[in-house]
Amino acid sequence: MNFLVLFFSYSIFVLPYSILVYGISKDRKCCEYGNSVDSSKILYIAGSVRKRRKTFEKKINVSNFEREGNANGYKHIDNKGIYATKQNLEFDEARNKEANENNKNDATTVNRKIIIESENKNNHNNQEQNIKDCYTNENAQNDEKNKKVKIPKVGNAMPEKKPDWFHVPAPNGEKYKKLKSDLGKLKLHTVCEEAQCPNIGECWNIGTATIMLLGDTCTRGCKFCSIKTSSKPPPPDINEPFNTAKAICEWDINYIVITSVDRDDLPDGGADHFAKTVELIKFSKPSILIECLVSDFQGNIDSIKRLALSGLDVYAHNIETVKRLQKYVRDKRANYEQSLYVLKKAKEINPNLYTKTSIMLGLGETQDEVLQTMKDARSNDIDVITFGQYLRPTKNHLNVVEYISPQMFNYYKDVGLKMGFKYIASGPLVRSSYMAGEYFMKNMVEKGRNQKNQQIKPVELKLVTELDKLTECIQKEIKHREISVFIQVHAFLVNVFVLVRA
């Protein structure tokens, strides 16, 4: 029953009105399309079942402008549905007034139209040309800035091929084979093999190798290094310090470089293991010169002190690259400031040490960044720095951004010597433990030792004379005591013999 009442009420009241509204709205569409509607009026139609139904017209006094969020501000809708800007409308009104006031003929008005339109076009073209000139000037300035400071991206596409100066013969030779067999028998690792150093044949054939302690597995994952990584590497070999000292003392060498993997899993970072190795080598062969290329020990002062006072001659730790590229190249646990801090502290703990660092080039650094790194190293009292070309060990590592020319390596060397570095090894194939640096370090350390010996020589002579006098007195005393003891023993035996006879 209720349903019927609702149906009849809807058909009587609502349906006729909706048809009426639909017809009106269809006949009187919005004047946007200009369908026979007065241009000074816009019809708004609203219909709703719930609200009171009305139709109303809103009159606009200015003209039928329609608001738009653009640069022109408004759009005009004429009877033909053609859009025009407000500026054009004002121009048309001014033109009509001028024509009516002067009462000129059609030819003059047409000519004036042409002149005005041409002037308007010229002004518009001039504005566009000025805008283009502004953009071209900005682009030219940006290009000049980019030319001045062009920072390459880390990990860019590899250059097509290596230059000629990187071609190195395959490692071979009797000393190379002997050294490799000796290392294999004693289960010792070398960074030469693990890091795929290009100088392995040249160095091993003259009896120079860089021993790697604490195993062959690193706890850090730097993006330039090919050494194995693991968060839980095997524990260090207890016999490794003894085996290393034994092997080094058997080789006919006077300079040895000892390095290690990072061992963040150990409480001291492996500093005590390192120091024991140095102490055993120095005890067996005091004349040998030892360079230790170590990790940062996470900035632990006790670890740095333990190694710095172990008897080594050169304390080396590599910065690896410029400050900006640290997070892209090195492990996140290593950083630029910490590396400089370690070298500075080692020098403060033992001023007799020579500190040394190394930087790889070709990773995307700029010349200014390299020079700034050299200044930072020198301000932290670093004595020796080396520069070498980064070479990608495998396809899974960082790409080489560029190959640095030998001329640029020589430039960095000259600038570094002027800064006050005691020595710089700089070249495409130079590495932190390259033999050219070792030759110099050997001479430099020996000069330092000779200077110390010359300073304490008079004291040593006095000590020698005093020792000679003491030894003579001791020998006389021993002889005197030996005679007295012999007499006493002889008298005792005589007395015993007499008693036995009795």
UniProtKB/Swiss-Prot annotation:
SUPFAM superfamilies: Radical SAM enzymes. It is found in: Plastid, Apicoplast. It comes from the Eukaryota. Its EC number is 2.8.1.8. Keywords: 4Fe-4S, Apicoplast, Iron, Iron-sulfur, Metal-binding, Plastid, S-adenosyl-L-methionine, Signal, Transferase. It catalyses: [[Fe-S] cluster scaffold protein carrying a second [4Fe-4S](2+) cluster] + N(6)-octanoyl-L-lysyl-[protein] + 2 oxidized [2Fe-2S]-[ferredoxin] + 2 S-adenosyl-L-methionine + 4 H(+) = [[Fe-S] cluster scaffold protein] + N(6)-[(R)-dihydrolipoyl]-L-lysyl-[protein] + 4 Fe(3+) + 2 hydrogen sulfide + 2 5'-deoxyadenosine + 2 L-methionine + 2 reduced [2Fe-2S]-[ferredoxin]. Belongs to the radical SAM superfamily. Lipoyl synthase family. NCBIfam families: lipA, PRK05481.1, PRK12928.1. This is Lipoyl synthase, apicoplast. The lineage of its organism: Eukaryota, Sar, Alveolata, Apicomplexa, Aconoidasida.
